[in-house]
Each structure stands twice: as C-alpha cells, then as structure tokens.
Amino acid sequence: MFQNYAATYYNPLYDMNQTNFEETKTTGFTNNFEVDWRVIDELRVRGRFGLTKSNEQMKKFRSPFNTEFNSQADIANKGSYEERNTQNLNYDGDFSLTYGKLFNEKHMVNVVGGMRLSQNGSNNSAYKVQGFIDDEFSNPAFALGYQKDGNATYQDSKKRAVSYYLNFGYAYDDRYLLDVNYRSDGSSVFGSDRQFTNTWSVGLGWNIHKEAFFSDIEGISLLKLRASIGNPGNQNFDDYISTRIYTYNTDNMNIFGSSAIVSNLGNRNLEWQKTLDRNIGFDIIFLDNRLRVNFDYFNKRTDPLLVQIGTASSTGVKTLPRNVGKQITEGITLTMNYSIIRREDMFWSVNMNLRHQTSEYKEVSEVLTKYNLDNRNRNLTRYYDGGSPSDLWAVRSCGIDPATGREIFLDKNGEQTFVHNYDDEVVVGNSDPKVEGVIGTSFYYKGFSASINLRYRLGGQIFMQTLYDKVENLSSSKKWENLDKRALYDRWKQPGDQAKFKSIASSEVTPISSRFVEDNNVLSGESISLGYESTAPWLKHIGASSMSVRAYMNDIFRISTVKNERGLSYPFARSVSFSLGVTF
C-alpha cells in the first residue's frame, strides 16, 4: 500500500496474508427401499420409497485488517463473520402394476399403471455479525454486534406433488408400434383452483425393414419411422409462487406486536405451463451396419407461459406471477456414427451430433409492456410478439467517433446520432447458436482404448458484460482501483484515434448498445480419455483376473472468438483424473 496526493493504492495480494476463510461442510444420507413381486409371468407389482436428508453449513470470516475495511473508522464495523445452515429432507415413492404378454405370436401388449408422490422440504437459517478486534479470534462470540439494520434470517419451504399414470403399448408383428401415455399430476406450486392438470402423449412407429417388400433391398439393415405428440407439464418454479405470503415487519412494532406486510401476492388461478410437443423422425442403419443415422424434427408450443409481471408500487410487491402468451420452439437434431474399422482386436469409429432450434413469442399481452420498459437499461431481454426469448435488444452502434471520442448510434431510420434513445432499440443478436453439438472418435486395439469428444458452437452472439462494467462505466473512484488494462490502453485519447472504447476522460454512464455484442463461436475439449485393460497371465499370481488403467480429461481446452474476462465468476474448470481397477 502506498499513497500520493491523489489517492491511496492497495496491493490486492495484501489481503491474501490475512486470516480469511470460507468453508462449506456437507453431510448427507440416502436410503432407497424397493419391493418387486412377480405375481404371474405376465403380471408384476413394484413399490419403491426413497428418503434423502442433507445438511450444509457455510462459514465465512473476513479479517478486520482487510483493505475493504480501511474506510471504516469504528472498530465495530471492521471484520465480519457469516454463517448459513441449510437442511433438506426429501422423499419420494411410487407404486406400479405391469402387465405384458404376446398373443398369437404377433400381438404384443404392455400395460403399466401406477402412482408417484414426492415432497421436497428445505429449512434455511443465516446470520451475520461484525466488529472483530483481532483476526486471531474468529469465533462469532467475539463479535461486537450485528450489522446495522441486519437480523438473522429463517425460511422453511415445502413442495409436494402427486401423479397417477397409465401407459399402454402395442406392437403388431414387430412392424407397427403404438404407445399411449396418460398422467394426472398435482402440485402445490400452482394455484389452489388449478393444482391438478392432465398430460398425455401418443407415439407411432413403423419398422419398414420388417416389411416383406423391403426384404429384397440390400445394404439397409434398419429403417424406422417415428412420430409422437403430447403435452408434458412443467412445475420447475418456486415452491410458493401461487401462494400469498406475509413477512413479519420487526422494524415497526405496535402495542399488538409485530406488523406483517405482503411479500408475495399469489395467484389462486395460476395454471400449469403446458407444452404441446410434436416430433417426427427416422432411424436408419446401412453400409453393412457401419453407419447409423438418427434424425428428429420437433415443434413445441407452450401455452400458457408463466411470467413474473411487474405491478404497481401501491400493491407492496414488485411482481405477480401470471399466465401470459405463448412460445413456439422448433428445430432439428441429427446423430451419426460410422465404424471405420470393425475387427475383433481393433475398432475405430467417428461420431457427431448437431442441434438447431428457434423460438418465437406469440400473443404476448400488453401487460408485459412495463416489464420491457423497466428493463431497458438493465438487460437485453424483451417480450414482444414475433420476438425470440434469446433475442438481444439494444440500440445499434457505429463505434467511436475518431474526432470526438463519443459513441455514434443509429436510430430506427438508419441515421447517425450522438444521442442514445431506447426507442431506437432493435434486435442486434441472438444468444442461441445457429448450430451446436459434439464431434468425436473412439479407438480400441488389443486392450488399448482412446476417445476424444469436442463440443462446438457456431453462430449466436453474447453481451460482453465485463467490457461494459470494467472498461467503461467507471466512476472517478474506480479509476484508481485494479482494472482491466483495456480501460487505460484501448480508450480514445486524442483526435484521430481509431479506438474501440470511448474517451478516457469521459465519466458519463455508457448505455447498452450493440458495441458490446460479439459473435460467440466456441470449440472445447469436452472429454478425452485413454485406457488400457489387461488379462495377462501374471495377474493370476495375485489372484486377479483383469486390470484396467484409465486417464480422463474434461474441458481441457476452450477456443472462442470471444476474448472476455470472467470477472468475479469462477474460471472454466479443467479436470484431469486417473483410475485403477482390479477384478479378483
């Protein structure tokens, strides 16, 4: 640390030598009990019950000597200790009857009926104290008190669900296939008047290669057409999203005790978010079983959507869950696998898959207008008819004016201006890739094995949050802190500079624009493995029959068109592991 007439500078390595710690301890218990009774050859009864309990404790201590507390003159505000405790208790169970029989050697019938129930419970408590005289005493008992206006917190939540289902499958001569599924699901997440919903699906299949007319066609060993339609439900929402919740207001006591305020309005008519899912595809194997291809086209229509809508300030809450509009998603998936070498002692294959999809909003209500207006200067997401959930909305930018160092914008009429106006917002990108998937290869030779899988992402854009926060939008005080070097070297400084970032002398807030949106193409080493398995005679001397050694690497590299700092996020994890297995 050193000082000059302008400011005080801190070495970020100084805090590393202080007594700081953050640790998390987790314990868990899981038990599953299952009963399986085959009453007769065709009838089977199964029951299962599972219980999971876990406890997690987080402790975090910040030394009073850390530089973050240098601005605090009162010792009661220096140093802090935080503790959070979470207890989870979950159970689930199901009961089913299964019947399957082949009639007249051509009619295969399978019927499954049953029910399932579950409960997810969570208990959370936390507190934070401050004021430590010395970092040798990190026990919270040595703290001088709670944070100003800070209290201990406590939350208890439960989510329950129950479902009843009936599945029917029929196959005629292994050529024509039919699957019918029906479910009735209930969940405490949704409104008391709409807690149950019915979901269904129907699937058809045709094994063309089983037909008599196909027997003369050589080179194709399997050809199957598939089609399905159904409406699966979605209950991945907050436990009490539809329930009115009151919070005790301990800051305003009266003669009757503590007051209560509404923290969640709830909605007793809140419906399940339903999706009509349609799919058609085919499977084919040919070239002497060397090439396998699977193709699917899907179309998903979600109606209604479940959206948090902004409310008037007089209600006392910021948002209210409502069912609004529709979303249509369609796309394709393709998987291919080709066996280049296929021998008893050697095998080599290559594989690839890809996915492409687009989404669009339909019949979006005007109630989302306030949401769009409130989020103009916060993010790039908007709800508009015909828009996509992954569209990036911003004002178009022509870059930095070399003469003045100011940003030049394009309005909706295509004219250049120095004035940023949110009414000129247009779609400047889409966060979804044009296509993404995995390409890989597998090799085996006399006990040696190797596999490589690379994940790719082509097309799509990303908002450069680090550039927006750490290179521009810097206050006068932050200019003296440790910053991205581009905040100093890549800014406009004098007339004629061809700079990517605005004038270094400007401290005005930079609005969101397309200047911070870049193409995001990625290639990463998703998984790489090497192994060797041996059944050598010498293993018998130690009583073993086989031995295997393997090495695994996950996300070992990442190549991207985006050069972006991770900020406060964790770096991309690169893991390397080894395993040794011996079979006796």
Language-model segments: which ranges?
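Conserved small-residue
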Residues: 126-128, 322, 339-431, 462
